[in-house]
């Protein structure tokens, strides 16, 4: 659906564009306390390997300033923090205060705070100067953004020339047998697990539907190019269930 129109998708529902942000906010307020459990259920625990791979694609160095966008509970930031060191900086930005609060508590409990900042921010209108970050990484967050092109353009603006964005997101399986199994798990079992474990079947159903509505690998690549990124590429993980996209700013 054209993101400039007055309606957009919320899972499989069509909703007014100005309502999607609040609806997504409600979902993540509902699941914030059990977000990591949600990721385990949605990925059978493999999300840790996917995140590790995404971080390797960032090619991080000591002293860099990194934006962990839609950083929520800090699961990527805790991997980034030791790689940039005390001379570096990790900014965790998320539109949802409940997710940020969970992340702040968890990282403090793990003793990770020296080079971490938390900022509540909208991905479509990032409150940072031009050419500010060496890298931007966004994990499992882009599909929940109302206007993805606006968010990508905002990311492009705040990345330094020579820097790049890494996007880790659920995508489209490339193997037909895997797709059939994955669909059965996602639509039949996962919402029931959400109801049983998190007492929240509807939020889990939205999360599954949001994955199906997210652009496929090539469509996202094209959207990144439209936003100004160059030399864009992607890696399929787990047969395309997840893809890691990367795009440069020159």
UniProtKB/Swiss-Prot annotation:
Catalytic activity: a 2-demethylmenaquinol + S-adenosyl-L-methionine = a menaquinol + S-adenosyl-L-homocysteine + H(+); a 2-methoxy-6-(all-trans-polyprenyl)benzene-1,4-diol + S-adenosyl-L-methionine = a 5-methoxy-2-methyl-3-(all-trans-polyprenyl)benzene-1,4-diol + S-adenosyl-L-homocysteine + H(+)
Presence of the UniProt keyword Lyase in the record: no
MF terms in GO: 2-methoxy-6-polyprenyl-1,4-benzoquinol methyltransferase activity; demethylmenaquinone methyltransferase activity
Superkingdom, natural source: Bacteria
CDD domains: AdoMet_MTases (cd02440)
Signal peptide (residue range): none
Enzyme class: transferase
Disulphide-bridged cysteine pairs: none
InterPro entries: SAM-dependent_MTases_sf, UbiE/COQ5_MeTrFase, UbiE/COQ5_MeTrFase_CS
Keywords, ordered alphabetically: Menaquinone biosynthesis, Methyltransferase, S-adenosyl-L-methionine, Transferase, Ubiquinone biosynthesis
Keyword Calcium: no
Residues reported in the UniProt entry to bind S-adenosyl-L-methionine: 73, 94, 122-123
Pathway: Quinol/quinone metabolism; menaquinone biosynthesis; menaquinol from 1,4-dihydroxy-2-naphthoate: step 2/2; Cofactor biosynthesis; ubiquinone biosynthesis
A GO biological-process term: menaquinone biosynthetic process
EC number: 2.1.1.163, 2.1.1.201
Cited function: Methyltransferase required for the conversion of demethylmenaquinol (DMKH2) to menaquinol (MKH2) and the conversion of 2-polyprenyl-6-methoxy-1,4-benzoquinol (DDMQH2) to 2-polyprenyl-3-methyl-6-methoxy-1,4-benzoquinol (DMQH2).
Family classification: Belongs to the class I-like SAM-binding methyltransferase superfamily. MenG/UbiE family.
Protein name, UniProt field: Ubiquinone/menaquinone biosynthesis C-methyltransferase UbiE
Organism lineage: Bacteria, Pseudomonadati, Pseudomonadota, Gammaproteobacteria, Legionellales
